[in-house]
Amino acid sequence: MSARQTNNRCGIELSFLGFILNPPTGLSVYFILLIAFILGLMHGITPDEHTWPITFSYSIGSYSTKGGMKSGFIFSSGFTVQRAILTTLGFVGLATIYIKFNLDGPVYVLVGVVMFVVGYYLLKGTDLHIPLDRLFGGHVHHSTKSERLPIQEVESNVKAVPAKMAFFHGFIAGWGFGGFSTIITFILAPQMPSVFYAPLVGVLFGLGTMVMQVVIGATFANIMRVKKLSLEQIKYVGRSTAARTLYLGGIAFAAIGALVLGFPFIDRIAINTGNPIPNLSSIGVATVLVIMVVGVIGMSSLYMGYRESVALQRTKTTESK
């Protein structure tokens, strides 16, 4: 391919991207819904603080491809319901509250509280109920009784991740507002012929997000299979990772939300990347949350769970001899 052909191709791709991210007025209903769906696909695949941390937690806790896909589907269903409401508000002009007030802080706090409560529920009854000391290498001051139990008993003590909570979590997280939300709420939704059509913009956006979240959920759920663990070990690692991530991730979300509430300027601090796609256009608080919850807390919890499962299996093998 010649340099001229390459430049022409890049120009076409940039023109298409510009059309999607800056849609003109006067579009037909079908075009509006198509653009909303494509935006949803882009939203689902890019690292977003309102989707990835929660999808990671619920998906990896399901410890299977089918379970991960289910978690992504359920979470996105709640998210889709909220987006339908949001685009309806955009059509009637009530979504201007997002212009007048920064709601990121309250949403982060609420999402964090729900994550913490679910994580605490999963950890209650085992020595994992205060995982901070072990995660950060501090003094172990609580009982380690469960570490001496057979792996079947330990696995049963860490409760299964309640998939239905993912729906509620998706609905709450949907109230967060970013670049994609701006496009569907203030540009696409007002172009619909009536208020009865306005929710369809949010629904198609949610469905696009759902497609990618199902794929991402399945990917997260299969991380542990790389190490070829037994089903019992995978269950333990998945559940303990999900529980720790929700528990500690909830604290992180609530803490950052409180900071944004107290010092709103923090939410405006960002490094421009030059990429026009929302979620990739800058590195700011949202990016820090994704890295902190999924990259640091999630991966650390996964590593801890893996080491614990191997140690428990080794103990079980030794005791059986």
Report each predicted region and the residues it spans:
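Small-residue-enriched transmembrane helix starts and helix-helix packing motifs
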Residues: 4-46, 69-73, 148-176, 197-205, ...
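Juxtamembrane transmembrane-helix termini in multi-pass membrane transport proteins
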Residues: 19-99, 183-198
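Short helix-coil transition sites and intra-membrane helix breaks within transmembrane domains
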Residues: 40-50, 120-127, 173-181, 212-216
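Membrane helix-loop-helix hairpins that form the core translocation module of multi-pass transporters
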Residues: 65-148
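Transmembrane helix exit motif
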Residues: 113-147, 215, 251-269, 297-306
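C-terminal regulatory/interaction regions
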Residues: 196, 226, 235-321
